[in-house]
Amino acid sequence: VMNLWPGVRLRVTEGWDEDGHHSEESLHYEGRAVDITASDRDRNKYAMLARLAVEAGF
């Protein structure tokens, strides 16, 4: 991520949910999902970020 988007920071906003804020089928209840934002708020990065996560084994 640092090489692809210099200066952009990622922030994890949620990784586990036990309060019922997500849909019934959400992987947050199993600790297998994460909500992330980018410091530049560019949502166009999210598809590439998802691909990078899969390539890294997430």
From Swiss-Prot:
Instruction: Please give the biological process terms from Gene Ontology that the record holds.
Output: cell fate specification; cell-cell signaling; proteolysis; regulation of gene expression; smoothened signaling pathway
Residues holding Ca(2+) 2: 14, 17, 19
Which Gene3D superfamilies does this one have? 3.30.1380.10
State the SUPFAM superfamilies in the record: Hedgehog/DD-peptidase
PTM description: The C-terminal domain displays an autoproteolysis activity and a cholesterol transferase activity. Both activities result in the cleavage of the full-length protein and covalent attachment of a cholesterol moiety to the C-terminal of the newly generated N-terminal fragment (N-product). The N-product is the active species in both local and long-range signaling, whereas the C-product has no signaling activity. Cholesterylation is required for N-product targeting to lipid rafts and multimerization.
Principal localization?
membrane
Give this protein's Gene Ontology molecular function annotations.
calcium ion binding; patched binding; peptidase activity
Name the positions where Ca(2+) 1 binds: 13-14
**What residues does Zn(2+) bind to?**
28, 35
Q: Which UniProt keywords apply?
A: Autocatalytic cleavage, Calcium, Cell membrane, Developmental protein, Hydrolase, Lipoprotein, Membrane, Metal-binding, Palmitate, Protease, Secreted, Zinc
What's one Pfam family the UniProt record gives for this protein? Answer: HH_signal
Q: Which domain of life is it from?
A: Eukaryota
Q: Which InterPro entries match?
A: Hedgehog (IPR001657), Hedgehog_sig/DD-Pept_Zn-bd_sf (IPR009045), Hedgehog_Signaling (IPR050387), Hedgehog_signalling_dom (IPR000320)
The answer to whether keyword Calcium applies is yes
Where does the protein end up? Cell membrane; Secreted, Extracellular space
May I have one GO cellular component term?
Answer: plasma membrane
Q: Does the keyword Zinc apply?
A: yes
Comment text on domains: The indian hedgehog protein N-product binds calcium and zinc ions; this stabilizes the protein fold and is essential for protein-protein interactions mediated by this domain.
Question: Hey, which family's this protein in?
Answer: Belongs to the hedgehog family.
**Function field:** Intercellular signal essential for a variety of patterning events during development.
User: What PANTHER family does the record tag this protein with?
Assistant: HEDGEHOG, INDIAN HEDGEHOG PROTEIN
| Name of the protein this chain belongs to | Indian hedgehog protein
| Naturally occurring in which organism (per UniProt) | Trigonostigma heteromorpha (Harlequin rasbora)
As recorded in Swiss-Prot or TrEMBL, the protein's gene is named: ihh
